[in-house]
Amino acid sequence: LVLRGARQTGKTTLVRKFAAGFETFVEINLEKDHVRRIFSEVKDIKDVVQSIEGISNKRIIPGKTILFIDEIQNSVSAIKLLRFFHEEMPQLHVISAGSLLEVRMKTEGWSFPVGRVEFLYLYPASFDEFIRARGEGVLLEELMAMRVGRGTPLPVHDRLTELILDYMIVGGMPEAVAQYAASGSLAAARNCHESLSSSFKEDFAKYSREAEAEHLKSVWDQVPFEAGSRINYARLAGEQRGSREVSKA
């Protein structure tokens, strides 16, 4: 299983919680050089498993273990080896997660083994999930019971209106929602947004050339001011950059 989605949408946390129901859980992260080397230097899948056991100090038992390969976009070799987990160790539960996989696939020309992996996508929290995170389960039930043409009590309508306005500000990124749910502070959510924005901008340089990364950072900073408007590359480019270069990036 390959779990896809943007950074910081909770992929790793979700897998860890799911794995709590299994006898053993082995997690490796392909942002670490010594872990990536396992997949680039070892080709036999059983030797790969043995190497993972060695660095994790845990036994991997098919049928009882979940092997979690995080940040798989950092290793083409690991992606290619997924088919051999499927073919040679079909009883072993393997979950991988990655961000910006589509970008890597397009820029580097590789693909996932056809018919050997399944995909699930994880998105930011919906409005329903936002209400649940706030602990307002009864209000959520009222929302789910609403039907067109059926009246809604004014207090319920007013509270939902308040929450949807908050949701428009907080958004659905799990950490921002958690900060807001815990404190009720929009400022706390805003601080989280700034941290997330910085981490996203750092990723531009990883997946594009330096010049393109600078264009992307410029667009990223400008987009909030263009929300709701028709895309205009000249406006997004600003005075210092050409619209053609920005469009290409």
Regions found by a protein language model. Give the residues of each.
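Interdomain hinge/linker elements that couple catalytic modules in large macromolecular machines
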Residues: 132, 137-249
